[in-house]
Amino acid sequence: MSSLREPGQAWQSPLRESCQSCHCGGFAPLPRIYCARIPVPFTPPKPIAPTPEELRGSTVLVVDDERAWRVILETDLKMLGYKVSMAEDADQALVRAQADKPEVAIIDLMLPEPMDGWGLLNELRARGQKVPVIFYTAYPVFPSGTDDPDVVGYMSKAVDRADLYALLPVAIRRSRERRNSES
């Protein structure tokens, strides 16, 4: 049985025989794994460590073309005590970086044309803005052998956000050390 359905037709589980006793009767609006009769493993999120007091108020630039991710990260980062600067593409990010002077940037690797995350990092450098970067992406494939001093880490959007936020103090301290050594 094909899992594709015609418009307006209810989704029919390919496992209909084993689904007869539940509320959906084999016609669940969502794929079978969401059937109320089947326990779905749940891993609770990791607790997010509080932001060290000396880092509260640090500016984080978030660059992502997906509005939902920008909202999630902005909400979390503000709750953690950071100032947040938002951009949905590389052009906006360059303007925000110039105006807000972020201490760290969280950049989606797969930004829309004309400039992806790497292109944005290179353009920031060309403009004299050395900002530690945490790249994150929906694609779990990261470059291997990249030893770039401005890249603090690569994260998949599928991982627990606590892991992403744990990199922020490292990146901000690196940014402050660099600024102190240059002045």
Regions of interest found by a model, annotated:
Residues D64-E66, K157:
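Acidic di-acidic motifs
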Residues R67-S85:
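Two-component/phosphorelay signaling modules centered on CheY-like receiver
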Residues M86-V104, L109:
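Acidic, metal-coordinating helix/loop segments flanking the phosphotransfer/catalytic sites
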Residues I134-Y136:
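Hydrophobic/aromatic residues positioned on beta-strands within the core alpha/beta folds
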